[in-house]
């Protein structure tokens, strides 16, 4: 699982050769901790298709502000330097998978 920082964001996300699924999360967020295992499994399952990474809400305020994150967990899917879509507080692994499939199909 990729830990994404402000300093590495351009290379790790915007210039990536595959789509990047980003989880904006925080250690103090119980829902973030609850959905983390599903996010990790999806990241492993889709490793050939995309890169999965996490941005810590408390440690990366510039990225939080840049993307207007006010609710966590928020997942964003990036491709070719652009945000393709986002989902707030996905309820399950199936919801994350559906988000990926629907967003990449656009």
Where are the predicted features?
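Conserved helix-turn-beta segment immediately C-terminal to the redox Cys motif
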Residues: 17-19, 34-55
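Mid-chain, well-packed structural core segment of small domains
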Residues: 64-70
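Conserved redox-active cysteine motifs that mediate thiol-disulfide chemistry
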Residues: 24-38
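Short pre-active-site segment immediately N-terminal to redox-active cysteine/selenocysteine motifs
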Residues: 17-18, 24-28, 71
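Non-catalytic, surface beta->alpha helical segment in thiol-disulfide oxidoreductase systems
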Residues: 71, 77-106
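Conserved Rossmann-like nucleotide-binding pocket used by diverse enzymes
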Residues: 5, 25, 51-53
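Structural microenvironment flanking redox-active thiols in thiol-disulfide oxidoreductases
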Residues: 55-63
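A short beta-strand-turn-helix
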Residues: 2-20, 61
């Amino acid at each position: 699982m990729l830990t994404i920082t402000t300093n590495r964001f351009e290379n790790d996300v915007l210039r990536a050769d595959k789509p990047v699924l980003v989880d904006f999360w925080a250690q103090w967020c119980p829902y973030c901790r609850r959905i983390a295992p599903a996010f990790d499994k999806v990241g492993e399952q889709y490793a050939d298709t995309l890169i999965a990474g996490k941005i810590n809400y408390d440690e990366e305020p510039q990225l939080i502000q840049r993307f207007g994150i006010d609710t966590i967990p928020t997942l964003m899917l990036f491709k070719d330097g652009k945000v393709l879509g986002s989902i707030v507080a996905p309820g399950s692994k199936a919801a994350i998978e559906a988000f990926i499939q629907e967003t990449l199909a656009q």
